């Protein structure tokens, strides 16, 4: 009598089914992880802008996106000379909320470009009050798959 060598077809089919079930469970969790890590990354990239804004204000200059037109302005480094966001996860970066004329203002980044489709369109806002205190808020209403768990530590919705 010959001994069996290898696997039967049914055994291989069972293994493939198990792998398929595990992949179906893992993929959505992985997508959520990617969305949160990308959101956290953009908050970190805006932190560099916050530091540059504080430094410009300390020197008596007006923070600006793009090349400074004169000695009273300071480029905070979040955009290229062409005006596009340096980060491949941001579709736009803006200065608003008074443009730091009195020390208060906002840095706003809209997620887009290479950001995960679930978070594209969300707006991350770093707001500075006149005393120099920064707060982070995220508006995910424009993002098609936004979930509250994408909000990184230190920010609020």
Curated annotation (Swiss-Prot):
Belongs to the N-Me-Phe pilin family. It comes from Moraxella bovis. This is Fimbrial protein Q. Disulfide bonds join 136-155. Residues 1-6 form a propeptide. One of its GO terms (biological process) is cell adhesion. Moraxella bovis can express either a Q or a I pilin, the inversion of 2 kb of DNA determines which pilin is expressed. The modification N-methylphenylalanine is found at residue 7. Keywords: Disulfide bond, Fimbrium, Methylation. SUPFAM superfamilies: Pili subunits (SSF54523). It comes from the Bacteria. The pili are polar flexible filaments of about 5.4 nanometers diameter and 2.5 micrometers average length; they consist of only a single polypeptide chain arranged in a helical configuration of five subunits per turn in the assembled pilus. Pfam families: N_methyl, Pilin. It is found in: Fimbrium. One of its GO terms (cellular component) is type II protein secretion system complex.
């Amino acid at each position: 009598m010959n001994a069996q060598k290898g696997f039967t077809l049914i055994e291989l089919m069972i293994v493939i089914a198990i792998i398929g079930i595990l992949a179906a469970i893992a993929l959505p969790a992985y997508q959520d992880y990617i969305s949160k890590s990308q959101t956290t990354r953009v908050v970190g990239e805006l932190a560099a802008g916050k530091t540059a804004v504080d430094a410009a204000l300390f020197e008596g200059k007006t923070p600006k996106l793009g090349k400074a037109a004169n000695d009273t302005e300071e480029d905070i480094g979040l955009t290229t000379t062409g005006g596009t966001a340096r980060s491949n996860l941001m579709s736009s970066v803006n200065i608003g909320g008074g443009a730091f004329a009195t020390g208060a203002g906002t840095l706003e980044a809209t997620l887009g470009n290479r950001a995960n489709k679930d978070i594209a369109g969300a707006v991350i806002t770093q707001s500075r009050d006149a005393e120099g205190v920064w707060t982070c808020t995220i508006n995910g209403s424009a993002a098609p798959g936004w979930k509250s768990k994408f909000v990184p530590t230190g920010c609020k919705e």
